[in-house]
Amino acid sequence: MKKFFIFLFFILLNFNYLSALDVKEINYYKDNKAWLVNDNNLPIVAIKFAFKAGSGIDPIGKKGLASMTASLLDEGAGNYSAKEFKKILADNSITLNFNVSHDNFYIDLYTLKENLDLSFQLLDLALTKPTFKLEEINRIKGNIKLVLKQSYKDPNDISARLFREILFKDHPYQYDTLGVSEDIDKIEKKDLESFLNNNLTIEKLFVAASGDIKEAELKKYLKKYFVKFDNKKKVNEIPTHKKNINSEIFLHKKDLRQSSILFAGKGISRNDPYFYSAYVMNYILGGGGFFSRLTTEVREKRGLVYSVYSYLYRYDKYNFFSGGAQTSNENVVKVIKIIKGELIKVKKKGVTEEELKNAKNYLINSYVLRLDSNNKVASMLLNTQMDGLNTDFFEKRNDYINSVSLEDIKKVASRILDENQIFFLVIGNPIDLKNINKI
């Protein structure tokens, strides 16, 4: 009982924090805005940047360019060698990371307040004067090719690759963000420089910060170091993806003790009026861990899997509903049948009042736990800003969830959970699996 009251107190404390989350929008150049939550409890600052320049814009024949560029930016810049650059970061407790998704080129900066000037100077060097020495390029190429080679042996990586090939055939999202092995050796220094010069443009930049930094300070740094990225060049765009999903089962036969199962169907956009209905529905169906319907039916009642899950996934150019499970080869047919059955049940009958109440309670009370550090707050600000939402989202978010009704869930389920538009991918050696497409 004591633990319960401690937990309840913590939830209420965080709830008050969420309500008081004061998000400032700073207009620092033309139409560019940064979001900031000032928190001077600790002398720490977290800043997140995102350019719309992920691996999805990699040119044909140079797949992996965005990722390789990100990997090389801290491998020497200005007059610093790779070793010297990393040492000055470490000596001053500065974390500076570059990485990419299919849609975005991310920069994470985490530093003590007293080292803000130095942090931005080093970030500026990395973005404007990377050395791109041949020795470092070749080393990073070797690392990337090794990871890609190993990915063809790992069942999880195989599943992800084949899943993308089915869902995103003939689209840039089809490829791993690391690229394609045969393209890696084709990438030269001039390609890396061209990527930076042509794609990291302020028109496609999002910025979010949390910690011991004031509005005027953040604006000063952004104007000083990022206005120069107003290069007015035409940035490569990822094409829209249109995929008609059919009711199919794909099999990649592999001699494994267990089979991996992935499935996917129609998704929903972030600005759809029924997005929160889909969000709550997914939690009840397969996003709620041990409390979801899929876990109850497939694991708890029948003991067929260790875990089973579902989620809503969003790319800039495509949205989909997906999920997966792992089970013994002899139980694959059973698991697929149960998953399909549960999707149909929610589509036809919806969910119960109790399920809806429990889902709302969890989704509301757990949200604040995702905002318990400057890094997490900055990440949440960045993602919310990139979703095209306003700074008052954090005040309204819980109301959006509370407003979801049983009828709303039935309506959105009828759109998303169409058994005729969901495919399954199995990797393993399943028994008695019929009507399959081998890949």
Where are these regions (language model features)?
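Charge-rich, well-structured scaffold segments of protease-associated domains
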Residues: 84-234, 251, 301-302, 306-439
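Sec-dependent N-terminal signal peptides
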Residues: 4-15
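Boundary at the C-terminal end of the N-terminal hydrophobic targeting segment
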Residues: 18-20
